[in-house]
């Protein structure tokens, strides 16, 4: 099925949010699975709300997620002549007509229909008047008066709409601009789109678009409407649920493969498998496993999944990824140094911001180590500082200052003085780290180096 063509068509009226990102991922995976094409189209016909900064942000988010597209980027704002040519074709064939009813009169018609318990719609006053162009006039589709529209949705199964409930929708506004449904149908048809996967908030547009496909003589694509993503409380997802725009997740320190993996699982499944490499998703993705029930967004699970990917990433690659976050903490460190540190600390972080912060005490000079007051009071007592001084002497005497040497020096001090490890280690740890936590003490000492470790111990003894 190399003839499969899918598309993603965001409006540049805001940053790419996770619902839109999931739609893009589904369409990208379907195209890549069948060796087809994935088209990216910017729906910027709303000139007042569309902003270049949002277009740039959407494109950057797509690239960050690894969603490449085929062919040129399409802008609807550059295709008005094409849309108008198809509107003219509909007028010539009798499938559309000019309407001069002002908006307030149309709204009055809708109110009258509501009062009668009917679907609010335009009453077709201008359908048979044979009007032509004129100021304030719009072009409407001449929809069939009766019948049903039935299609096989890839997610929902058979879906039917009564044509009598549909409006004679506007195709060209009074200012000459084409409307959303007209532009979408013309674009999808002329770009050869075969499959349209989108959120089920678009389901009500589908019968209108099918009427346009039929009026223009275009072949219908396969439609699939995936349920919206809900919050943990099963209400519409919003920022209060912890949902962010894709660009915010990047700034927050998530890895793109984690976000892609998580969003795919919010609406698609392959048995009980939770973790997928991108290549696996391309291989296994299919519309038959798209879920018809809405999934709930769980920020904790996303954090857990991102932590998994942090720990699976090579030290060199993870160092490259965390470098800008370390720089944001105020440190000028090269990636080779970070590649030594991240294996010790990635178990203690679930995102790159956390990873940069938990490594902070390893990057500051001895004079700037921040001491936790409670840890100092508990561990750096007079006896504790005496043990720190003793360990300091043992470390200073080492010929080779490496992990094994540091471990032996501490062990020899403990054994030589008839002590237990727990009597010595907490004080030395607080002296080196500034707190009780952290990875293995000898590992950290070896990475800090002799001079830095001795300076930290000297400072702690002097407290």
Swiss-Prot record:
Motif 'HIGH' region per record, residues: 10-20
Biological-process GO terms, alphabetical: glutamyl-tRNA aminoacylation
Major location category of this protein: cytoplasm
Catalytic activity: tRNA(Glu) + L-glutamate + ATP = L-glutamyl-tRNA(Glu) + AMP + diphosphate
EC number in record: 6.1.1.17
Family in the record: Belongs to the class-I aminoacyl-tRNA synthetase family. Glutamate--tRNA ligase type 1 subfamily.
Functional summary from the UniProt entry: Catalyzes the attachment of glutamate to tRNA(Glu) in a two-step reaction: glutamate is first activated by ATP to form Glu-AMP and then transferred to the acceptor end of tRNA(Glu).
Protein name (record): Glutamate--tRNA ligase
């Amino acid at each position: 099925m190399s003839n499969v063509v899918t598309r993603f068509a965001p409006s540049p009226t805001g940053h790419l949010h996770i619902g839109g990102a999931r739609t893009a991922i589904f369409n990208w995976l379907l195209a890549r699975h069948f060796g087809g094409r994935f088209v990216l189209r910017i729906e910027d016909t709303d000139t007042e709300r569309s902003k270049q900064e949002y277009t740039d942000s959407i494109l950057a988010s797509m690239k960050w997620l690894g969603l490449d597209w085929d062919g040129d980027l399409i802008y609807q704002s550059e295709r008005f002549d094409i849309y108008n040519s198809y509107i003219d074709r509909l007028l010539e064939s009798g499938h559309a007509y000019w309407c001069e009813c002002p908006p307030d009169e149309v709204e009055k018609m809708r109110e009258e229909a509501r009062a009668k318990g009917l679907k609010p719609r335009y009453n077709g006053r201008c359908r048979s008047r044979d009007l032509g162009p004129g100021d304030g006039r719009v072009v409407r589709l001449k929809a069939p008066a009766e019948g049903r529209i039935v299609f096989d949705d890839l997610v929902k199964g058979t879906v039917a709409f009564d044509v009598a409930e549909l409006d004679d929708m506007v195709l060209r506004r009074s200012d000459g601009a084409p409307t959303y449904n007209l532009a979408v149908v013309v674009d999808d048809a002329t770009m050869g789109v075969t499959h349209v996967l989108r959120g089920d908030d678009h389901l009500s547009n589908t019968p209108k678009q099918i009427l346009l496909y039929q009026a223009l003589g275009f072949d219908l694509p396969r439609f699939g409407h995936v349920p919206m993503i809900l919050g943990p409380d099963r209400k519409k997802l919003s920022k209060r649920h912890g949902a962010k725009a894709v660009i915010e997740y990047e700034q927050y320190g998530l890895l793109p493969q984690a976000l892609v993996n998580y969003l795919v699982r919010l609406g698609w499944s392959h048995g009980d498998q939770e973790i997928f490499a991108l290549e696996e998703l391309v291989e296994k993705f299919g519309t038959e496993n798209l879920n018809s029930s809405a999934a709930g967004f769980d920020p904790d699970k996303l954090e857990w999944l991102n932590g998994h990917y942090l720990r699976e990433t090579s030290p060199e690659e993870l160092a490259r990824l965390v470098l800008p976050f370390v720089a944001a903490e105020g440190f000028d460190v090269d990636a080779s140094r970070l590649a030594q540190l991240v294996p010790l600390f990635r178990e203690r972080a679930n995102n790159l911001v956390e990873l940069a912060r938990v490594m902070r005490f390893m990057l500051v000079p001895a004079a700037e180590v921040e001491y936790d007051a409670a840890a100092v009071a508990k561990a750096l007592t007079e006896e504790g500082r005496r043990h720190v001084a003793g360990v300091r002497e043992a470390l200073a005497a080492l010929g080779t200052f490496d992990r094994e040497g540091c471990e032996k020096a501490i062990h020899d001090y403990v054994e030589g003085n008839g002590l237990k490890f727990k009597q010595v280690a907490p004080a030395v740890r607080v002296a080196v780290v500034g707190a009780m936590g952290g990875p293995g003490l000898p590992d950290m000492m070896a990475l800090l180096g002799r001079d830095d470790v001795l300076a930290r111990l000297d400072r702690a003894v002097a407290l």
